[in-house]
Amino acid sequence: MKISYHGHSVVRIETNGKTILIDPFITGNTTTDLNAADVKADVILLTHGHGDHVGDTVEIAKRNNALVVATFELATYLSWQGVETFGMNIGGAREFDFGTVKFTQAFHSSGFVTEDKQIIYLGMPTGILFTAEGKTIYHAGDTGLFSDMKLIGERHSIDVAFLPIGDSFTMGPEDAAVAAEWLGAKLVVPIHYNTFPPIAQDPQQFVSLLPPGVGRALQPGESIEL
């Protein structure tokens, strides 16, 4: 399994002959190394409906005939735009040919702001547990610290956890360090920082809060192999 980070909250997983993208916010992402027009994907997983996470989903999904897996409301909304979707919800797991997807809770919000000043509710925000080849990846999405992260860590052996550290809209570094401890992940990678001024952070400072060897700040385009 190959896992790549592409700035903000964009993660790519290559496994079982498939390419899976999580939260493909590319156009307008000042930290990414990707060009949306060149991105290939078989599957897109979405944590919630904010624009900096849904991003280029519709364009990428249509061009690649990719399946989009998201919460029921978000999946329904995207299906109306001609995208193939599979709707799920928090606590539910589904085994696909590319791996198993399970949605966890997240403490945040989820909605799309339209140009005519309307907000479309798009279900609950989530985290994602993705399991394939005997490895489990946890992408927390956007969230504050919550005590059930302990339960997630108890119920699942997490190989890599992607945790937001930007503060303002999500956990900051200190709370994310507590989350890392509760989750017990073998490797913790910071996400959702430095894209916009309100979420400016030093990822190495976050890494320094973790036990030696647990934290690793990936550069956009950098990969790890499991």
UniProtKB/Swiss-Prot annotation:
Gene3D superfamilies: Ribonuclease Z/Hydroxyacylglutathione hydrolase-like. Keywords: Hydrolase. InterPro entries: Metallo-B-lactamas (IPR001279), RibonucZ/Hydroxyglut_hydro (IPR036866), UPF0173 (IPR022877), UPF0173_UPF0282_UlaG_hydrolase (IPR050114). GO terms for molecular function: hydrolase activity. Pfam families: Lactamase_B_3. Belongs to the UPF0173 family. This is UPF0173 metal-dependent hydrolase GTNG_2675. It comes from Geobacillus thermodenitrificans (strain NG80-2).
